UniProtKB/Swiss-Prot annotation:
The modification N-methyltyrosine is found at residue 7. One of its GO terms (cellular component) is plasma membrane. The lineage of its organism: Bacteria, Pseudomonadati, Pseudomonadota, Gammaproteobacteria, Lysobacterales. The gene is xpsI. Pfam families: N_methyl. Component of the type II secretion system required for the energy-dependent secretion of extracellular factors such as proteases and toxins from the periplasm. Part of the pseudopilus tip complex that is critical for the recognition and binding of secretion substrates. This is Type II secretion system protein I. GO terms for biological process: protein secretion by the type II secretion system. The chain crosses the membrane at residues 7-29.
Length: 138
């Protein structure tokens, strides 16, 4: 009786099953990594847009309380800006206010690029604005 050399059909099937399982796990990892890279790219671009939007506030037009909104990159990023006087918690409410004194404004910028809660950035900053920059004569 001769001994057969080679692999049996069951051994080949088991090898293919293990290979398929390994490829499935590998592709799942690559898919997750690609999703994380895409999310990091969107977050980085949103941060750059937010910095640019905040940098130009008060440059072309005087900074006044109100709301603005818009979109960037063909609507991929949507932003809204809320400008309001800063409410100083330690300020005495009865203290007289000099109309020619500079005003502190709080800018709240929200940049969104999706519907998920982690697909938005919220920036808050303060700007000191002179009375003449607000349109009030000094």
């Amino acid at each position: 009786m001769k001994h057969q050399r080679g692999y049996s059909l069951i051994e080949v099937i088991v090898a293919f099953a293990l290979l398929a399982l390994a490829l499935t796990l590998l592709l799942g990892s690559l898919s997750g990594a690609a999703r994380q890279v895409r999310g990091a790219d969107d977050s980085t671009r949103a941060t750059l847009h937010a910095q640019s939007l905040l940098a130009v506030q008060g440059m072309e037009q005087p900074l006044v309380p109100g709301q603005q909104q818009g979109s960037l990159e063909d609507g991929h990023f949507r932003w809204s800006l809320d400008v309001r006087p800063y409410d100083e918690p330690r300020r005495n409410a009865q203290a007289p206010v000099d109309p020619s004194a500079p005003t502190l404004l709080q800018l709240t910028l929200v940049v969104r690029w999706g519907e998920q809660p982690n697909q938005r950035l919220l920036w808050r900053t303060l700007r000191l604005v002179t009375a003449t920059a607000q349109g009030n004569p000094a």
